[in-house]
Amino acid sequence: MLLDEKLDKLMKTILRLKAYKEEENLRRVIGEFHSIIDYAYEGMYIAEDMLREEESKGKEVSTY
């Protein structure tokens, strides 16, 4: 599922962020924060689409 893929990428990015922070590699830390924001937004939009689909299916069932 697409949402699961985004969550996996987000978790892996968080782990890399922690590693770069420990190394005091601030350029990489900044890059990983950008990636986290991107994955979070993508996941949010995917979840919103899934919710809309769920709600529209619920309306279809209730109209019969």
Curated annotation (Swiss-Prot):
Top-level taxonomic group: Bacteria
Identification of the protein by name: SPbeta prophage-derived uncharacterized protein YopV
Organism name: Bacillus subtilis (strain 168)
